Amino acid sequence: MARVKLPLSAAGRVHDMGGQPGGPVPIDPQGEPVFAQNWQARALAVTVAAGGLGKWTLDESRHARERLPAEDYMAYGYYEKWMAGLATLLVEHGLVTMDELRSGQVAADGAQGVGQYDPVPPTAAQVRAALARGGPSRRPDRTPPRFASGQKVQVLSPDSAARQPGGHTRLPAYAAHQTGVIISHHGSHVLPDSNAHGLGENPEHLYGVCFYANDLWPEQVGSKDEVCLDLWESYLVAVDA
């Protein structure tokens, strides 16, 4: 696969929630298999199983993939990113060593790595039940919401909103500095920008914000389409009436 050079943000971010410009976006054919190759199913299974150890959050696992070197991020397929991110997390959290990863063998002393955990994998029924429960991010409100339905707000840039330089955020770059209207309030939810870096959940109010498509992409002149995004409170500033 050819490696594509892309302009990065000021903080060096290659990953963006809204993707990168330059389309067109390919449409997946109808009826294609869930996994193009058998190893991809195993990649999903081992990632879910490792997540069950409770050593990292969903946000942290996403950021582990995002911080791959830019060349690797653009060259790897979807599940290759998953496996590279998982390897990073396993080493960083002391579950395996680099030597264990390279050899595929548990260290003889068993002092570090997977040897300290129960080797019995969860059953299919247990996995099914865990996935059905999910991991709800809703938390009790700690403060009143800053914005109300119908209010105009402006969106910060991803680099301004992120809690760490080049860090994790769920704010797409195409919405930066754009003005939208609050259409819904979802209550307080875990802030991914904080949670991905081990800085705590720091729940914030989450809003549905609506934009005109031709404001986001001027080439869509005359379009009556609207784009609605769920955005955390710290991504937004009020627009004076």
Where is each model-derived feature located?
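Basic/aromatic-rich interaction segments and small domains that mediate binding to polyanionic partners
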Residues: 14-47, 89-90, 131, 137-149, ...
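N-terminal intrinsically disordered, low-complexity, charge/repeat-rich segments that act as generic
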Residues: 1-117
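Short, basic/aromatic beta-hairpin or loop at an interaction surface
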Residues: 117-134
